[in-house]
Amino acid sequence: DWLELGSEALWAMNEAWIRSGARPPRLWPFVLIGQTIDRKLYDNLNTYTGEDGSDGVVRVASANLNASYVSLKPKPGSRRFDALEVNEVISGPKVAMRVVPGRAHAGKDLGIMRSVRSRRTNDSVDNEITVNAIMRCFLVRTRNQYNRLCAAFDAETEALQSQEQVEESPRFISRRTFVHDIYSQVIFRVRDSQQCELNDFELLLTAKRASPNTLPVGFLKDRQRNRLQRSTLTYYLNHNIMTGNTEIPGVREKSPGCIQLGLEVHAKPNRGLVRFKDAKLQASASILKALLRANETVLV
């Protein structure tokens, strides 16, 4: 239960990390993860083993320690519904995070640890990149060196994700094309005015004209509700589609994405003498920027 997305313990740990500010002296975390799916390990009963934006087990956005916290509160003065406004935006400490090429979570062929061998193989270049990335982490001795490595890892990750976006798989009878987009993870926790959990509610994302119908097609990859903390929802969003993607000839047309993002919360009961009012956060470009972070998780 602890590791389930949106668990109370996981939220507390992540919020504490985000609020921690500067790291202790001479402690520099590093994150290395692949985003390659080992098709031989795909489980037809568990589609998450082939989930985009992951290594087949862990999402890049989950592994990435670069995370943010956003709190919303009711804006005073509204009668028909509670207009929400941003109360707090906190970005966690900057962490060096690198997506390495051709690596999955496990397995002797593509596993990020098990597949690295001393002898030369067909994927020796990917092995060398993985080992070199680890050695570059070991060589860090100062804050300036760490900051430079953070910037280098960011640039290398961006280049790699562009390079690995389209995968032509020879493992199927007919040619199969997989598109590996970048993803963002947003974990929503809903409370009432007394900080009590809400278990019966609807949460809608909105775009221009404050409508959920103006969001781009295919923007939502996955949505999960925590089994124990029923007031917590995790949205897994396609960052490329949300921000606008370029054409992939023969695979996908160009789409403009959205320039604004907002949300609505409809809690139950919403009728009767004692009831909840709807809560709405007006869609805006600033909310889109705050909630949609490439390869990252945002707690809201």
Language model regions located:
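Helical cap/lid subdomain of alpha/beta-hydrolase-fold lipid enzymes
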Residues: 1-169
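Short, surface-exposed loop/turn motifs at beta-strand boundaries within globular domains
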Residues: 25, 179-183
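Short, flexible beta-strand-to-coil junctions
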Residues: 34-37, 192-194, 266-270
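Extracellular beta-sheet/turn segments enriched in Thr/Pro/Gly and aliphatic residues
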Residues: 160-179, 260-300
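A short, amphipathic beta-strand motif
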Residues: 184-192
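Short, ordered, surface-exposed loop/turn motifs in non-cytosolic proteins
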Residues: 194-213
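Tryptophan-paired
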Residues: 211-254
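A glycine-anchored, Pro-Gly-centered beta-turn/N-cap motif
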Residues: 255-259
